[in-house]
Amino acid sequence: MTRSPGADPEPATGALAGAPLRSADRVYARVKAMAVFYRLRPSERINEVELARRLGVSRTPLREALNRLAAEGFLEATVNRGYSVLPLDPKRVLTLYEYRATLEIGALRLAAERADEGGLDQLDALARRTQHSTGQDALAQLAADEAFHTHLVALADNAEMLRSLRSLNERMRFIRWIDLDKGQPGHWTDEHATMVALLRARDAGAGAALMQAHITRRLDRITEMIRAGFAEIYTGNALAARILGDAA
């Protein structure tokens, strides 16, 4: 059975399922997961009364969570209309991938200057992990891929870049899972090994060009999939139900 995304996915599942939520942070985590996995229908106004009832909480922590998620870009806030989940459409996906490319290319250039051999050895081990993950399910591939790219950005030794990537990973996780779950394994894992070699050679130019091509290929594939349409992307799918622990 295919597992659905939510990494760091496995620990989150138990925390999201089960008894009514009691803290503002848990309400925030639950609603964020519902938004990311499209358990809330995109572009439709969120019914706060119904959602509070469903979660077993009052309107106060729920409104706090909605405000926070809107500020972080997970929800859209509209005057006199409330909150809604951003739709999964090609334009939004393009925006996210453009941001990711700009961020990771910049980080790679800094890493070529700043990374030490120990850090590159760790990155090499993570590149091998992504190669081994291709025989596993999409969730394992996604976890390995995220670990590689996160460590690469960490090698830039720039805390703001790393913080931005982690936030971006959360917003893109379901999109990237669709790519891995529906697509065929490609040569993207070999490109990770090449990136490590280019970083060891301190060849920032070639590394940046490879990163741009690497991300653009993934963008092209996921955009094509979204245009084709997948019913399970949106509310009511069993994949979201499994990760959130509620009925489809």
PLM feature spans:
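Short linear motifs at protein or domain termini
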Residues: 1-113, 223-248
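Membrane-interface catalytic loops of GT-C/OST-like multi-pass glycosylation enzymes that act
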Residues: 181
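Poly-acidic low-complexity segments
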Residues: 47, 137, 184-187, 191, ...
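Conserved amphipathic alpha-helical segments that form helical-bundle/coiled-coil interaction surfaces
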Residues: 113, 117-178, 187-197, 201, ...
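Mobile beta-alpha loop/short-helix "lid" or hinge segments that flank ligand
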Residues: 71, 75-76, 168, 184-186
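Conserved acidic
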Residues: 19, 23, 92-95, 99, ...
